[in-house]
UniProtKB/Swiss-Prot annotation:
Single GO MF descriptor: oxidoreductase activity, acting on the CH-OH group of donors, NAD or NADP as acceptor
PANTHER family: ALCOHOL DEHYDROGENASE
Record keywords, A-Z: Oxidoreductase
InterPro entries reported for this sequence: NAD(P)-bd_dom_sf (IPR036291), SDR_fam (IPR002347)
Keyword Oxidoreductase found: yes
Keyword match rRNA processing: no
Binding site for NADP(+): 12-36
UniProt-listed Enzyme Commission number(s): 1.-.-.-
Protein name, per record: Uncharacterized oxidoreductase Rv0484c
Entry annotation: catalytic residues: 149 (proton acceptor)
Organism: Mycobacterium tuberculosis (strain ATCC 25618 / H37Rv)
Gene Ontology terms: cellular component: plasma membrane
Length: 251
């Protein structure tokens, strides 16, 4: 077991190698947390941890043994940010790729379950724990071509909201963050590295950036312990739903 040499509160952030996870790690570190950055890409989280004075732990949330090792490595956890996740493809149900569906389920749903279950005893023992789960507006909406992702995100949201009730009376708060369009590596992963397709997702609009979501997570993490922000939906001004958005001329 690793005892972090600080009396600071400890925040574990999954998917911390880029995007919302990286921005959240930086935000929480600036607020005084000792951040444990968790992701698969060792080079990125090691550099991040060095920059923010945190700890890097390489782990894949789809790997049972890796998540168990993560839990053993930590002597204290005050905040958990379940951020690891993603989408694959944009096929209609009739053309669904089962491997894509399996990946999305294992990463978004079972990944959140594995990490939360493994760290929950330490969050309770902290006496003032917080679980933030980054879902998506896809957890509350559906859209054509998005069934695999929306199904996974609906399930992830249901997991989180169920836990909210199951932990009543325990010293742990739970907040679901449901972002809309955020320009990160998300679309690049979804379209298997096709930069042109990824760029087209945000063309003609002003999307959120990772720091926008991280700022909200930082706000949640610094509320008094009796205040529970159950769900926060955050979209760009240009987006009303997953399928409704404003488009401006490209200058």
């Amino acid at each position: 077991m690793t005892t972090i040499g600080t009396r600071k509160r400890v925040a574990v952030v999954t998917g911390a190698s880029s995007g919302i996870g990286e921005a959240t790690a930086r935000t929480l570190a600036a607020q005084g947390f000792h951040v444990v950055a968790v992701a698969r890409r060792a080079d990125r989280i090691t550099a991040l941890a060095n920059q923010i004075g945190g700890t890097a732990i390489v782990a894949d949330v789809t790997d049972d043994a890796a998540v168990e090792a993560l839990a053993r490595a930590l002597s204290r956890v005050d905040v958990l940010v379940n951020n690891a996740g993603g989408a694959k493809g944009l096929q209609f149900v009739a053309d669904a790729d089962l491997e894509h569906w399996r990946w999305m389920w294992d990463t978004n749903v079972l990944g959140t379950l594995r990490v939360t279950r493994a760290l929950l005893p330490k969050l309770i023992d902290s006496g003032d724990g917080l679980i933030v789960t980054v879902t998506s507006i896809a957890a509350i909406e559906v859209y054509d071509g998005g069934a695999g992702y929306t199904a996974a995100k609906h399930a992830q949201g249901a997991l989180h909201r169920t836990l909210r009730g199951e932990l009543l009376g325990k010293p742990v708060r739970l907040t679901e963050i449901a972002p809309g369009a955020v320009e990160t590596e998300f679309s690049l992963v979804r379209f298997d590295g096709d930069q042109q397709r990824a760029d087209a997702v945000y063309a003609g609009m002003t999307p959120l950036v990772a720091a926008d979501v991280a700022e909200v997570i930082g706000f949640v993490a610094t509320r008094p312990s009796h205040v529970n922000l159950d769900q926060i939906v955050i979209r760009p001004r240009d987006q009303a739903s997953a399928s409704r958005r404003a488009t401006h001329p490209v200058r």
